[in-house]
């Protein structure tokens, strides 16, 4: 399988970019990964890169976007930070990947059994990590369905907080970046959230987070703190 070129990138729609990732994840789960000559891809991309998607994911060693979506060199721009939080540096990276490098899709990808989410659930204090976990705390607060054992030992609670964090990050992208919001509104890029299972290898896209053009299925409706303030 060849890496994307300037010509092939120009034909990719946001919807097709999402389909590429769905198909790649199914290959990964079924252990039917596409054959790639990686050295040939190194040669093909030495003059430039033409990615079709950008993935914001956690630093967890099990969640490499290129692997779980079965993509090659030059296909995906990968942004990684614990808890898939959004800040100005993350947004700047996304703006470069979409406006400059031509990416057609932005995915915010959380994952099950996330250490950062668990740390936030347990109110862990540890050096600079505490500052990062504090940015996830609103997602813990916004989870209202679990009344007992609101700690990392409750898998259902952790899963709910994980999904809320993904949704907050998706919303923060369009709330805090004029560049990306306008590209979404013009249908130039798509934006969607998803959760990766470290047990099965499957990515579940949160369909109601999909934004592209006039299609926007959800608005974050969480009391008290808006997405922009909560993810700063």
Regions found by a protein language model. Name each.
Residues 1-48, 73-74, 83-104, 115-232:
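Divalent-metal-activated hydrolytic enzyme cores
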Residues 50-59, 63-65:
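Conserved H-X4-D acyltransferase segment
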Residues 52-54, 103-106:
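Short active-site oxyanion
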Residues 56-58, 80, 107-111, 192-197:
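Short beta-strand segments
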Residues 60-62, 111-116:
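Gly/Ser/Thr-rich loops at beta-strand to alpha-helix junctions
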Residues 62-79, 85:
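Catalytic core of membrane glycerolipid acyltransferases/transacylases, capturing the structured
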């Amino acid at each position: 399988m060849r890496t994307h070129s300037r010509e092939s990138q120009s034909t990719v729609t946001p919807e097709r970019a999402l389909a590429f990732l769905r198909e790649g994840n199914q290959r990964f789960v079924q252990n039917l990964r596409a054959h790639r000559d990686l050295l040939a891809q190194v040669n093909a991309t030495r003059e430039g890169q033409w990615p079709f998607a950008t993935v914001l994911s956690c630093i967890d060693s099990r969640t490499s976007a290129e692997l779980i979506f079965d993509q090659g060199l030059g296909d995906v721009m990968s942004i990684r930070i614990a808890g898939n939080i959004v800040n100005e540096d993350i947004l700047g990276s996304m703006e470069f990947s979409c406006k400059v490098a031509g990416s057609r899709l932005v995915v915010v990808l959380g994952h099950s059994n996330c250490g950062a989410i668990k740390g936030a659930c347990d109110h862990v204090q540890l050096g600079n990590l505490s500052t990062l976990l504090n940015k996830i705390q609103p997602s813990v607060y916004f989870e209202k369905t679990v009344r007992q054992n609101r700690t990392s030992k409750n898998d259902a609670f952790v899963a709910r907080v994980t999904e809320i964090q993904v949704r907050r990050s998706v919303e923060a992208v369009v709330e805090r970046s004029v560049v990306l919001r306008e590209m979404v509104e013009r249908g130039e890029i798509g934006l969607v959230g998803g959760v990766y299972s470290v047990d099965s290898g499957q990515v579940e896209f949160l369909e109601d987070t999909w934004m592209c053009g006039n299609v926007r299925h959800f608005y974050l409706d969480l009391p008290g703190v808006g997405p922009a303030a909560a993810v700063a």
